[in-house]
Amino acid sequence: MPKISVIGAGNVGATLAQRLIEKDFADVVMLDVVEGIPQGKALDISQSANVLGFSHTITGSNDYAETAGSEIVVITAGIARKPGMTREELLAINQKIMTDVVSNCLKYSPEATLVVVSNPVDTMTYLAWKLSGLPRKRVVGLSGVLDGGRLATFVARELGVKPSAVTPCVMGEHGGSMVVMPRFTLVSGKPLSELVSAEKADELAKRAVNGGAEIVAFLKTGSAFYAPSASIAAMAEAIFTGSGKVMNCAAVLDGEYGLKNIVLGVPVKLGKGGLQEIITLPLDGTENARLLASAEVVKGQIAALSL
């Protein structure tokens, strides 16, 4: 049976595993280093099969051998930045975690496509690509699907349309330097830049950029996981089914947008084996400058890795 593995059984990983098994296109293995957590959560999710009608199995495990033969491996493992911790300290810890995860995943699933979720996601996707030695098409990261979903929500509320009527375009770093592209964000086929003022577009963009932080401010002791898990599940489904769907993802660039040897959020086509095509948009001078500025932020993070 086809298989997808999720590494990490925290809020994002477990909710993702639930969404994947409910889509019912593959068996799901949820792995975590903490004994009992993935097993208990998988058992709980499995007991909804009769109610929801899915037929594939979900398994929780602490053993990477259970992930063998996965077509897709989603990596959510990593720690969040704690008070007093420098970015360099966070990167060092998450680099060690990513090194262990990539090594073990590819040991049992050498043909898998890797989908990276761990933060800072652009840098961790770059690290996974370097560690794995895989072709760039087989390593992608979550970025613009989530950021675009946030943008679409705020645009839809502003214009009184359904979120599904919005085709968002968000590029660059998954973070503070993220670049919203109003000219390429469409609402029922019309550019957002033609529907709202530049000031309103900036306001909507800022809210999308701060979407995750806004949720953290409400929750106090946690961060977003419902929208992230839905975004990852959509990426996994596009890869698994070979749909060729256009999504904004963190991808390894090799000359696109004048950038090389870096991971950055750009529009891509996802299909069998991962990245089918990077779509190069005709950016104007201002848009290109903002994208390059965002790339500099990611370059700084990559430079802090021990490679």
Swiss-Prot record:
UniProt-listed Enzyme Commission number(s): 1.1.1.37
Annotated residues for binding of NAD(+): 8-13, 32, 94, 117-119
List of catalytic residues: 174 (proton acceptor)
Keywords per UniProt: NAD, Oxidoreductase, Tricarboxylic acid cycle
Catalytic reaction list: (S)-malate + NAD(+) = oxaloacetate + NADH + H(+)
Superkingdom to which the source organism belongs: Bacteria
Gene3D superfamilies hit by this protein: Lactate dehydrogenase/glycoside hydrolase, family 4, C-terminal, NAD(P)-binding Rossmann-like Domain
Pfam families the UniProt entry points to: Ldh_1_C (PF02866), Ldh_1_N (PF00056)
Entries under InterPro entries matching the protein: L-lactate/malate_DH, Lactate/malate_DH_C, Lactate/malate_DH_N, Lactate_DH/Glyco_Ohase_4_C, Malate_DH_type3, NAD(P)-bd_dom_sf
MF terms in GO: L-lactate dehydrogenase activity; L-malate dehydrogenase (NAD+) activity
Binding locations of substrate: 81, 87, 119, 150
Entry function: Catalyzes the reversible oxidation of malate to oxaloacetate.
Family annotation (HAMAP family): Malate_dehydrog_3
NCBIfam families in alphabetical order: MalateDH_bact, PRK06223.1
Name of the protein described by the UniProt record: Malate dehydrogenase
Source organism of the structure: Dehalococcoides mccartyi (strain ATCC BAA-2266 / KCTC 15142 / 195) (Dehalococcoides ethenogenes (strain 195))
